[in-house]
Amino acid sequence: SVTVVIEPDGFLPDGILSPFIYYLGYESGKALYFNQVAVPEFWEIAGNNQFAHILEDSRERGVIHYVDAPQARLVKQVDWKDLSGRIYQADHYNRYGACFAKTTYSADGQAILTKYQDAKGQEIVLENHVTGDILLTLPGQALRHFKNRVEFTIFFLQDLGIDTRHLL
């Protein structure tokens, strides 16, 4: 039997699949340690066991969120902030140390778009959080459009040949 989750999580255990992660094809690498996050020159990272701050002079320009094992200080997400302290983008990391997705936020803090990219940096999945639409671009195939996560997940299950008659 196969376990499938709809949420895109870069740290899913072996044997658990997500349609958002599956098509990206990441297979090797090590999770990123908090002080390995790329930051502009002269910015610094200050971390503790709960999270880390990215600082420009003394201004917070980002927050690094760890995976659920906080002692490890492995990067799950980086929220980037503008000069007013508003989050404008979140970078999502996987257990291979790669930034596999980027979410863009509106001025009022609402998620607008998430772009999922493969190991080569090619955009594979685009999720519009405003409309719910999802676009899937696979190499050598026509662009596929889904109205929502349910349609996308059904396609994923069919694409893998998973029997959908016994879903929980």
What are these regions (language model features)?
Residues 45-150:
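Repetitive, compositionally biased segments used for assembly/scaffolding
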Residues 1-36, 117-168:
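Long terminal segments
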Residues 15-63:
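Extended, small-residue-rich solenoid/repeat segments and analogous flexible loops
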